[in-house]
Every structure is written in C-alpha cells, then in structure tokens.
C-alpha cells in the first residue's frame, strides 16, 4: 500500500494536491477570497467522528492500510519538494508546492454520491407546510410506508433558508482563472500554446483515465 500511494502520487500529483485542498478546506489559500464559500462548506461537512474507528470500518486493518498509503504519497511529495526540477508544470504555473497528506484526506467526502440531497430538503419543506400524510399522498411513495415525520428538534422555519449553498459551494469543480497564474505564464506565447491544447482536447475521446493503446500483434 505504501508503493501504491507512491505510484499514484507520481502519476497524479497535481490532482492529488487539488483534492487535498478540497478535502481540507484550503483552496482559498491559493485562489483567494472567491473560494471562501467552498472552504467554509468543506469544513462544515468535515468528518468529526472517531478517526480510528472510521478507518477500521473499511477493513480490519484499515488504519494500517490507509496510513501506509498516505506514507507512500508523502514519500513521493517529499522527493519532489527536495528536487525542484521534478515539480510538475501545473505547480510552477500556480507558484505552489504539494503539501503532505493525512488519513483524513483519504476518507474525505468531497466527491460523495449525494445526488438526492435536494430532494430530501424539498420533502422536508413539504412536510413542514402540509404534514407527512398529505406529502405521502402527493408523492405516491407506495408500496413502502416511509416515516416522514420531522424530528421535533428541527426548527422548521430554517428549512426554507438556502441551506444547500455551502454544500453546492464545496461540491463544485475547481476553476482556474488567468490571474491565478504566475506572470511568466500569462504571456502571449503561453496563451497561444494553451489555446492550441484546448483545440486538441475538444474531442471527447482525446482524453481519458488509464487509456491504453495496444498493437494488434499483441
């Protein structure tokens, strides 16, 4: 697992750094105030339970496995920081360096499959307005009989505020702007090269994770 972490970081170091910042709520450190809402949302959804218990939930030796993986990631990061010429170009363009990972980054939920959260809130608002029984009739949830009663501890008025703004802020993809680049990478020549790359990558089949081309003779 150490080797897996090392190899993954070697192949995807910049992606790993952006993920780490998304997971730790530190994107604004490199992209400024426009990312504050994202970082606030990230920290709001941060896991605050028993970390050891969470790590071992995935596997009896989950803590050891994840810590070994993180150690591998960090070993490669250290080798890059100590050898500046190995630093991938995107870091140089932004004027940043990769930072160490922790186990918390590995189990972060910033890419969770939570697509029904909006529907859950809409149902909660409907229950607050007309009650659970009428909502069941309107939504036709048969043959099941879900319990739609709201927890009495919930302030129902708060359901009608923009509760999901922090969630959507931390879930959105990271977008870079010209002002984020170091001055030497904002020249006309650099922009021309970037535009050429964008033209090449317009084809949806031009890129892909782990794509391989094998000769027919094989």
Which residues fall in each region the model found?
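Substrate-recognition/specificity elements adjacent to catalytic centers across diverse enzyme folds
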Residues: 1-218
